[in-house]
From Swiss-Prot:
It comes from Hyphomonas neptunium (strain ATCC 15444). One of its GO terms (cellular component) is ribonucleoprotein complex. Belongs to the bacterial ribosomal protein bL21 family. PANTHER family: 50S RIBOSOMAL PROTEIN L21, LARGE RIBOSOMAL SUBUNIT PROTEIN BL21M. NCBIfam families: L21, PRK12278.1-4. Part of the 50S ribosomal subunit. Contacts protein L20. The gene is rplU. This is Large ribosomal subunit protein bL21.
Length: 205
């Protein structure tokens, strides 16, 4: 038996035991996921085509691993200007092993991921370091001098450990992509030229 499912805007033809790589869903490794968008189901010579979905059909799989796709490099350039930008991106993906194809309208119970055993905490264990406070960040640079960085964004950068112009100027493409994802900056480093501004301000500091 095979089925054609739709997830993440793409279609996949699957059978029991197949492992597919899809865009990451809200599930951890070891958990069970159910795909309700089944476009076609086939068994032997019989094929059922949905309109657009096959009523009562579901496909169940187990999350094998969470992975990341290959790095995609985007380069931007403007003619007759010294404008060069390089941005890297890696898509969050997951490997799913198909465990069953159901056509009776009943999906198997979801399997939760096994919980990791936590080591006993000692009473004398040191407390985790708190996020940098304004006093801790006082020894750094005034990041608000960079165009596009205001007080709120400066606090977010300080909390991420970025307190000086030199740190921003030394960020690699991977570091920038990670920061933009964590702080929801969506290409602000390249758009506003923060690395170049930080490099100039670091020289003046």
């Amino acid at each position: 038996m095979f089925a054609v499912i739709k997830t993440g805007g793409k279609q996949y033809k699957v059978a029991e035991g197949d492992t597919i790589v899809i865009e990451r869903l809200a599930a951890a490794a070891g958990e069970t996921v159910t795909f309700d968008s089944v476009l076609m189901v086939g068994a032997g010579a019989g094929v059922t085509v949905g309109a657009p979905m096959v009523a009562g059909a579901t496909v169940t799989g187990e999350v094998a691993a969470e992975v990341r796709g290959p790095k995609l490099i985007t380069r931007k350039k403007r003619q007759r200007q010294t404008y060069r930008r390089t941005i890297g991106h890696r898509q969050d993906l997951m490997e799913v092993t198909i465990t069953s194809i159901n056509t009776d309208g009943k999906a198997p119970a979801k399997k939760a991921a096994a919980k990791k055993e936590e080591a006993p905490k000692a009473d004398t264990a040191p407390k985790a370091a708190a996020a940098p406070t304004e006093e801790a960040a006082a020894g750094g640079d005034n990041l608000k001098k960079i165009t596009g960085i205001g007080p709120a964004l400066e606090k977010k950068l300080n909390a991420a450990g970025i307190t000086t112009f030199a740190q921003i100027a030394a960020l690699s493409a991977d570091d920038i992509a990670k920061l933009e994802e964590e702080l929801s900056l969506a290409g602000r480093f390249a758009k506003d030229g923060w690395v170049e501004q930080a490099a100039e301000l670091a020289k003046e500091a």
